[in-house]
Each structure stands twice: as structure tokens, then as C-alpha cells.
Amino acid sequence: MAKRIIYNENARRALEKGIDILAEAVAVTLGPKGRNVVLEKKFGAPQIINDGVTIAKEIELEDHIENTGVALIRQAASKTNDAAGDGTTTATVLAHAMVKAGLRNVAAGANAITLKKGIDKASDFLVGKIQENAKPIADSNAIAQVGTISAGNDEEVGKMIADAMDKVGKEGVISLEEGKSMETELEVTEGMRFDKGYISPYFATDTERMEAVLDEPYILLTDKKIGLVQDLVPVLEQIARTGKPLLIIAEDIEKEALATLVVNRLRGVLNVAAVKAPGFGDRRKAMIEDMAVLTNGQLITEDQGLKLENAKLEMLGTARRVTINKDTTTIVAEGNEVAVSTRCEQIKKQMDETDSTYDKEKLQERLAKLAGGVAVVKVGAATETEMKDKKLRLEDAINATKAAVEEGIVPGGGTTLAHMAPALEEWAASNLSGEELIGANIVASALTAPLMRIAENAGVNGAVVAENVKSKSFNEGYNAANGEYVDMLSAGIVDPAKVTRSGLQNAASIAGMVLTTECIVADMPEKKEAAAAGGGMGGDFDY
């Protein structure tokens, strides 16, 4: 296909146009008075959402060059989402502000490479500042505050997540599922999460989120490599008759067997997913045995004279629900309390008997995984559309609270970044010079963008609010919900430091890439073929 090549200013301006479009669509959702965005779906009802990264994923423009700009800034949002799970809108607004200010300087003749160096140095300085000012999470009240803000000021959600963390611990697993009633409920059940995802992405049942969700599956547990599909055929036939899904947890699955499973999954013959067992050697076997206890199944191992081809349905484990993504697998089980607590006692005895610190640590990990359980939040809503929106908000809130536990909290509402602008300007003036200094000042000018946008979405002049906030002490900021200047930490308006840090780093990275772009190679727009003339009723024909 023919390509068009665009250079210099034209290339950057085309990128900027795409970035403007995406940033505006995402920015309307920012803050307590941010609006929703409606996404039209080819199939099914439209989706009403308030989540930056989901909106960014939906935007595709007709012009290929502008679409490249959209894809670049979408990357800032999705990388922030991967790292911290929240703060995607802030990252987009920051990246947009940095690109706008930077392009003005490049157009005026500044050297883009030196500007980028200045931007990177400013970003490193700010990351240090954010970590310096982060306060560790003290109690479940602080967790509830983080959850409330991330869920779009829904206090009930914040409280529920704090309760869930109290019950399963700060490292515990919180899982979301669609409830049957109008109310959102919390339930704690047995279960575990381990750090292995699906072997092939073709096992994903939800392609938008790239997740495989199996309801009431059978679970086949084995410590051997599955090389031939013939070994699996007897079990697969028994399961196909029941119509239930199957999860296979094995040491590995080789290409031929994997290909057969994938083909059966895609053709709809059998809903199946396969995961490699976590750990190595004896430790791997012990972890699979833990899973067997949890799911009330049996480990199919040749040490006990059991072979895959002779496996019966009653040897397989069962679970209420299994969720698998590319990195983790979460099993939600139920009804095996006695077996699980006996197994936990066994592990505790092993811990008492071992002298090795390393073994103790690994046993402690296994115990935590098995005893911790899983908190299941059943999302309740009146309609399908509300359910999807609520699920996205809850997911953001869970991710934000986990990030807050990891790296602490900072004042929210765009306050932290705005307060750091004067400090950055001062540091840059004494440590940088020339175009590097201009690069750092580009970042400084962009730091107030999230706060200004939050204020504008609340119907107030953003520039005035930003200047007022800068003149106050570090913890004081603008509460857009009621239009007052308050101490953000006391008012419970807080952001996880990790979210603020990731958003800033990804925004600076993308801005640097856009500014140093000198040429774009993109597909030529396809020429639309002229429609054929309609038959009958022609103009100049004699009949």
C-alpha cells in the first residue's frame, strides 16, 4: 500500500490535532463534577462511562496521521493504568499540556532533543518530590477515602473496599462479579490468586479486557507436562457432556495439545483455559496440592499411580468462579472450610519444624495465599449500562487503594502537582540552563493543568483557582465538589502517590517522544470508488 510521508512542523501539527481530540474527550470526566461519556457500541446497548482509559481505547479517527497522535497519548493512559490502575485521565491531561507548550517552543526554533532532556530531568526531580511528600496509609479510614475519590466520590464504595481490605488483609485479593440484586454487596470466601496467566491469549472470553472468566468450572490439576492431546481426550469428553467449563493447571502444555485446546475453545466445542502451575520443583507440587485442597479435587500425579488418561470427573476440583488475565489467575472457591483450615495447620507445623529462613518465607507465602481468602464484591445496578459503569469505577477504586498501600498518599484534586510547580521552577533555575531550562519550565507550566481542568469542569475559572492554590500551604487545595479551599488530607481528598507518579512519568515520556518527532510515515487514505450508476430510470435513454 502507498505511504505518505510528512516532515517537520506539518508532522507535529497533525499529531497535535489527534492529541487535542482525545484529550478533550477524556478531560470532560475529570474531577467530582466531571461529566460522563457515552460510547456507541456496534452490538448491544451504548455504554456510559467515566473512565479515561476506556474512552481512550474507543477513539479511532479517519485521518491516519491524526490517529497516530491519538495512539501516542492513549499509550500514556494505558501505561498508567497498567502500573497503577487509576489516574489515566490525569496522565492524558498532563501529556496534552506538555505537548502543547513544547510544540510552541519547537516551532519557535528550540532544539527538541535538548528540550526532551530538560523534561526528563524535571520528571525525575518531581518523582523524588512526590515520594518525599507521600504519607503512609495509617488506617482503614484513609483507605476508604482513597476508594471514595477513585470511585467518583461514592462513599459507600470506599467504605466497602476498606472493609474488604480489613477482612482479607492489605495484600489480599478483591474480586469483582456482577450481582443479582440492585445493592452492591461484599462477601468473603475461600480462594487464592497466583502469578501465572493464561498460556494463550485465545483463551480469553472477554476480548475487550483480555480476561478469561469461567463460571463453576471443573479444574484439572496435574504436575506433569501435557504433550499429547490423546492424554486429555477421555477427560475432555466427560466434561463436554456436562457442558461446564474446564481449567487446566499443569507444569506446561506443549504446542500440539495447546493448539487442539485453542481450536476447541474457538469453535465453541468446549469452554477451556490452561494455566502453567506457579513455582518450581517440589514447591510447585506443594502449591498444586494446596489448590487441590481448596477446590476439593485431586492432584493427578504419577507418584500416586494416577494417569491423565484414566482421570475421572470426581478427581477434578470445582470452583465458583475463575478469572484469568495475562499475569494472574484468581480462583474463588466455596464450601471447603474444614479441608482448607486443616491444610493451613499442616503448613504452620512445617514452618515450626524448618530451620531455613528461605523455606519459612515460602511456607508463609503459601499460608497467606491459602488462608487469606478472596473478598468478592457483587456489583448491583438497575440496568446493564449502570452495571458496566459501576464495575469500571469499582475497579479503579480497588487499584487505587492497593497503590495507596504500596507508596502512600498525597493531597488529591490536582493539588500536589500544582504545589510542586514553583519548587520545580526554582530548582530548574539554579540547576539547568538554556533549552534544558525551557524543557523543565514546560513541565512546570503543565503541572497545573489537571487542577485547572477539575475547576473548569466545576464551572469555575481554572487559572484563578490554580494561582490561589499555589499561594497556599502544601496540603491546602481546591475542593471542586463545594467550591471551597480546604486542607485536602483532613477533607479526605487524597490520591495514591503511585498514581500521581506514574501519570507524571508516562505523560513526560510521551511528550518527549512527540516533540522529537521529525517525520511521519503513514498509509495513504483509500480512495472511495465511485458508486455504480443505478439501473432503470436512466436519464437519456429511449425506451
UniProtKB/Swiss-Prot annotation:
Regions annotated as coiled coil: none
PROSITE patterns, A to Z: CHAPERONINS_CPN60 (PS00296)
Catalytic activities: ATP + H2O + a folded polypeptide = ADP + phosphate + an unfolded polypeptide
InterPro entries xref list: Chaperonin_Cpn60_CS, Cpn60/GroEL, Cpn60/GroEL/TCP-1, GroEL-like_apical_dom_sf, GROEL-like_equatorial_sf, TCP-1-like_intermed_sf
Pfam families: Cpn60_TCP1 (PF00118)
Keywords tagged on the record: ATP-binding, Chaperone, Cytoplasm, Isomerase, Nucleotide-binding
Molecular function as annotated in GO: ATP binding; ATP-dependent protein folding chaperone; isomerase activity; unfolded protein binding
Binding sites annotated in the UniProt record for ATP: T29, L30, G31, P32, D86, G87, T88, T89, T90, G413, N479, A480, A481, D495
Cell location: Cytoplasm
Function per UniProt: Together with its co-chaperonin GroES, plays an essential role in assisting protein folding. The GroEL-GroES system forms a nano-cage that allows encapsulation of the non-native substrate proteins and provides a physical environment optimized to promote and accelerate protein folding.
Name by which UniProt lists this protein: Chaperonin GroEL 2
Encoding gene (name): groEL2
